[in-house]
Regions:
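Mid-domain alpha/beta scaffold segments of enzyme catalytic cores
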Residues: 1-198
Length: 198
């Protein structure tokens, strides 16, 4: 709501500023309708529909508030949304070991969504926080195409991910003086595989 006053003007101005596309990600079924509405508002907006691992414990997320933690039922209910032509990806999905989200539950959820992306031939928008080993295990198994946002892994892992066809997203923190690891990663991958994130 804090952006409501000038949102329309800002969104309309994006192409003039050189923006060629925007991918808005849902984090649970409760976000999906809003994300689809935005995706239908202009040809350069696209939707990603998925269940974020943190939605497994967020009380206001539909995963908890509506489905009482039954992500399988929620994912089944979301399935018809993927027929919408504005849906360009499955996301935001992934693993997050920073928060107290049951690890096996989020692993199973992520794997189910990777299977869905493969079945629908859609790319993925992936979240990976402090879960690199398990993340790479599933990426090796399913070999999705898409983007790993807010990349924080090593240069070697980045090279492997790019070889698999993934894009790597980097936020403003890469400009910090102490961001030496990010600088090494950016030097190790083709620039066209790096995405800037807000």
């Amino acid at each position: 709501r804090q952006f409501d006053a000038d949102r329309a003007a800002l969104l309309t101005a994006l192409p003039a500023g050189g923006v060629v596309g925007v991918l808005e990600c849902a984090t649970h079924s409760g976000d999906a309708v809003r994300v689809l509405e935005l995706a239908h508002s202009a040809p350069y907006f696209h939707a990603a529909i998925g269940i974020h691992p943190e939605s497994l414990i967020e009380e206001d997320a539909a995963t908890v508030a509506v489905y009482h933690g039954d992500w399988r039922a929620e994912l089944a209910a979301m399935r018809p949304l993927f027929a919408d032509k504005a849906v360009a990806a499955v996301g935001e999905i992934g693993l997050d070991h920073h928060w107290p989200v049951p690890r096996q539950e989020q692993y199973d959820l992520f794997e189910a969504q990777l299977q869905l992306a493969k079945e629908l031939d859609l790319p993925v928008s992936v979240h990976d926080r402090e879960a690199h080993a398990e993340m790479y295990e599933l990426l090796r198994k399913y070999k999705p195409r898409g983007a790993l946002h807010c990349y924080s892994g090593s240069a070697d892992d980045a090279a492997w991910l790019v070889e698999q066809g993934m894009y790597l997203g980097f936020g403003g923190a890469v400009t910090y003086k102490g961001a030496k690891r990010a600088a090494k990663v950016l030097a190790a991958i083709p620039h066209e595989r790096a995405l800037l994130e807000t």
